[in-house]
């Protein structure tokens, strides 16, 4: 049995385990893990910029005076730590990363149980006040937590990333999942192409698409032939 076969079997077992977990969540907590519309979301970069140090300090001195800005964010889980009555996770979108802090006392118990058992790759929506952890990390102290979409396929290893260059080129979405540099590259490329296209249109040029590959399969039209191998005499 090859290493690739073993890896495929391991991935199949992980997918089966995630499917089973999703089924339990649907039955026990009533989650809807197939994606749904969420209004009022802002990017993680925008949420981080709303952090107010003075409001955070005032809240620490008197928790009845909560003037911290509230945000609603969504992203893909890339880190997860469950620590009893607290769960910390890091989510990512196309603007960066942000920590979400979940307290058992601050949200419905069903939501906290889902948050404490997330898998890497799950897409979540969190709503709460912008604050800071005891270690000085800016975060969202969530009081509302929703699983927006369950990830069934396990992501590439956290530390090694995606080393298979062929897989990177064939499955760009996986490459973008593992590498922020890839996202930056595609953003830069998109901006360059868009700028060139806008300039050319402004100069009166017309964009015309030209087929680069033959649209009609021609393999069946090949004719069989005989050849001779001089060295082997066959």
Task: Give the location of each predicted region.
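Class II aminoacyl-tRNA synthetase-like tRNA-binding/catalytic domains
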Residues: 2-28, 33-234
């Amino acid at each position: 049995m090859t290493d690739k076969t073993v890896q495929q079997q391991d991935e199949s077992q992980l997918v089966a385990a995630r499917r089973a977990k999703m089924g339990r969540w649907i039955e026990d907590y009533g989650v809807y893990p197939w994606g749904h519309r969420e209004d009022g979301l802002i990017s993680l970069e925008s949420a981080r910029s709303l952090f107010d140090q003075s409001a955070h300090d005032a809240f620490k001195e008197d928790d009845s005076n909560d003037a911290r800005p509230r945000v609603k964010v969504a992203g893909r889980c890339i880190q997860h730590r469950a620590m009893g009555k607290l769960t910390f996770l890091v989510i990512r979108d196309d603007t960066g990363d942000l920590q979400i802090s979940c307290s058992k006392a601050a949200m419905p118990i069903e939501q906290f149980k889902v948050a404490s058992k997330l898998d890497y790759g799950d897409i979540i929506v969190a709503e709460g006040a912008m604050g800071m952890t005891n270690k000085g990390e800016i975060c969202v102290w969530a009081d509302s937590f929703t699983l927006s979409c369950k990830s069934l396929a396990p992501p590439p290893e956290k530390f090694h990333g995606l080393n298979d260059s062929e897989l990177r080129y064939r499955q760009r979405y996986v490459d973008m999942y593992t590498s922020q540099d890839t996202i930056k590259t595609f953003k830069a490329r998109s901006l360059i192409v868009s700028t060139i296209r806008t300039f050319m249109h402004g100069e009166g040029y017309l964009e015309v698409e030209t087929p680069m590959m033959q649209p009609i399969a021609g393999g069946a039209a090949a004719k069989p032939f005989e050849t001779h191998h001089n060295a082997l005499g066959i």
